Curated annotation (Swiss-Prot):
Entry keyword Zinc: yes
Family matches, as InterPro entries: Poxvirus_VLTF3, VLTF-3_Zn_ribbon
Protein name: Zinc finger protein B385R
Keywords tagged on the record: Late protein, Metal-binding, Zinc, Zinc-finger
Family of the protein in this entry: Belongs to the asfivirus B385R family.
Origin: domain of life: Viruses
């Protein structure tokens, strides 16, 4: 517990130092505003953490015999609530902002912001902040920016109509084209009505499903008006687990979906990853932002190609988790067993539908050089719990 508190305090000190150090520079007002957003977010997370553990702290001082039991319960809560990941996710965003600003100022930096260690991320952010301050003490020359070159991988970027800018095909970084007017006629149909956003903006579908597959969706989604926190649902599932003598550590997505069907709560099928984390204490792998961005770029391209090559007469709607499964199965190395656990949290449809999806995916891969086609193997996922 002390380790978590130290991490929160280190992050708070970092934000304060950045705010004070950059306040004198007008060009950093936007950056400071974004930093304050993350600062407020981390303070709220810290408050929530203290609220969760406060009852246990009171019990810890009530008697020596309870202390070990209480400490173990606090450790379990830290794991279940994913505290370290929440801190790390905020710091990843902060370091990305600092690194992006340095690159805009013409300063080359090493891409170190994807580490999952919060204390190393604080150190990285501090070093980036010092570099940012140092650039102000040097003479600033007007530079010609190479808009078509990615700032991080130095590869040629391609135009992305959904993001109104350029996007790197390697890391997924987006370069906004300032002061550019776009022709928006392709966003409207012949009747003058705006087209469905799902066709021209697949990014929002990707982000929705990634959030749910990684169990990052709000816990309030499990609740109802009568049961805001979803406590009743979790209790019902625990009763079924006990009744069927299931091993909690070996629960799968399919197990949870069957149990949800039994209690007539299939509306929570999208929340299976979150439920698994709440029940087992083990959540999906925390994929780095660089990999997620690359996945988003490939996903966007795949959906665009699908609209062109989809078979006529097929009425099945896009099942976006299938695309996410195929993309991560392709871009994650076979020996990366930690990150490849994400495949275990993606539900695949029935055999007939899966065969049709594979056939369609093969057509997409012919125009998608980033992905090499291979048939889906249901037995490919091995449990690493």
């Amino acid at each position: 517990m002390d380790e978590i508190i130290n991490k929160y305090q280190a992050v708070e000190k970092l934000f304060k130092e950045i705010q004070q150090g950059l306040a004198a520079y007008d060009q950093y007002k936007t950056l400071i505003s974004e930093m304050m957003h993350y600062n407020n977010h981390i303070k709220q997370e810290y408050f929530n953490f203290l609220m969760i553990i406060s009852p246990y702290l009171i019990r810890a001082h009530s008697g020596e015999t309870l202390r070990n039991k209480v400490n173990n319960e606090i450790k379990r809560l830290i794991l279940v609530e994913n505290i370290n990941t929440k801190i790390s996710k905020t710091l990843v965003s902060v370091n990305f902002l600092l690194q992006k600003k340095l690159s805009t100022d013409g300063v080359k930096t090493k891409n170190m912001w994807c580490t999952n260690n919060p204390m190393l991320q604080v150190k990285t952010a501090h070093n980036l902040f010092k570099q940012l301050c140092d650039t102000q003490s040097k003479t600033q020359w007007v530079q010609t920016l190479k808009y078509k070159e990615c700032k991080y991988c130095h590869t040629d970027m391609v135009f992305n109509t959904t993001q109104f800018g350029l996007q790197c095909p390697n890391c997924g970084c987006i370069q906004e084209l300032m002061g550019t007017i776009f022709d928006e006629t392709h966003f409207y149909n012949h009747d003058g009505q705006k087209a469905k956003s799902g066709i021209f903006n697949p990014n929002r579908h990707y982000r929705f499903w990634i959030e749910h597959i990684l169990g990052r969706n709000p816990e309030q989604e499990l609740g109802t008006k009568q049961d805001p926190c979803g406590t009743k649902v979790l209790q019902q599932l625990k009763k079924i687990i006990k009744r069927d003598n299931k091993c909690i550590a070996l629960l799968t997505v399919e197990n949870i979906r069957k149990m949800l069907k039994e209690i007539n709560r299939t509306d929570l099928n999208n929340c299976v990853s979150l439920i698994l984390r709440k029940l087992t204490g083990v959540g999906p792998p925390q994929i780095s932002e660089s990999i997620l961005l690359r996945g988003e770029y490939i996903f966007t391209e795949a959906i665009k190609i699908r609209e062109k090559v989809c078979k006529k007469g097929r009425i099945n709607r896009n099942y976006y988790p299938y695309y996410i499964y195929k993309i991560f199965d392709a871009i994650l190395p076979p020996n990366d067993t930690t990150n490849r656990r994400i495949l275990q949290y993606i539900h695949l449809q029935g055999n007939d539908t899966l065969a049709n999806n594979d056939s369609e995916w093969e057509s997409i891969c012919m125009e998608l050089p980033e992905i090499k086609w291979k048939p889906t193997d249901r037995t490919h996922c091995v449990h690493f719990f």
